[in-house]
């Protein structure tokens, strides 16, 4: 026989905030959170191509469009399409789009690098015999990849904001 107590189970979610507060947890965007000062303060470098445009759009979706930028985000994007699915006649039926972003966040007031690194990921798309559909699928995969990479970088910036938030 188990001594399962439903009341104890139901009160656990109520105790969670107290447990998190006791360990020093502060929401990143909370009133005293370290990332609160990042909204509208990060300016990504101007994009030079479609991938860059999609990447900057995704970064601005996370941190807001820069109104009074204190931090400059420099980045270099590289992508490579690789055939991964093959039919019996050796035609490619599926592609992976591998992407890499080398990035650096600089405090423009002190001109010091405060965070940086490399984000890598991939997306896939199926090849089709219709040219328009194939191009649309490839463009969609590229856009999804830029959003994924921007999310990875945003998470790293949020984690690092404890060290440099104003």
Each model region followed by its residue ranges:
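Flexible, low-complexity charged segments
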Residues: 24-28, 50, 164-165
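C-terminal/domain-edge helix-coil "capping" segments
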Residues: 136-166
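Acidic, proline/glycine-rich low-complexity intrinsically disordered segments
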Residues: 2, 44-46, 51, 61, ...
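Surface-exposed short loop/turn segments
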Residues: 66-116, 124-140, 151
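Bacterial Sec signal peptide processing site at the extreme N-terminus
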Residues: 20-39
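N-terminal export signals
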Residues: 8-25
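Post-signal peptide N-terminal segment of mature Sec-exported envelope proteins
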Residues: 33-55
């Amino acid at each position: 026989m188990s001594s399962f107590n439903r009341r104890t189970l139901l009160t656990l979610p109520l105790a969670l905030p107290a447990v998190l507060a006791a360990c020093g947890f502060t929401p990143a965007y909370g009133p005293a959170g370290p990332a609160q000062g990042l909204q509208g303060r990060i300016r990504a470098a101007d994009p030079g191509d479609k991938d860059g445009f999609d990447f900057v759009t995704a970064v601005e979706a996370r941190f807001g469009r820069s109104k009074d930028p204190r931090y400059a985000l420099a980045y270099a994007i590289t992508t490579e399409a690789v055939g991964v699915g093959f039919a019996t006649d050796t035609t490619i039926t599926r592609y992976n789009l591998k992407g890499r972003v080398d990035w650096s966040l600089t405090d423009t007031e002190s001109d010091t690098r405060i965070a940086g690194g490399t984000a890598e990921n991939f997306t896939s798309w199926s090849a089709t015999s219709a040219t328009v559909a194939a191009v649309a699928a490839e463009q969609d995969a590229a856009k999804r990849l830029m959003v994924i990479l921007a999310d990875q970088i945003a998470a790293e910036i949020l984690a690092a904001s404890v060290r440099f938030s104003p």
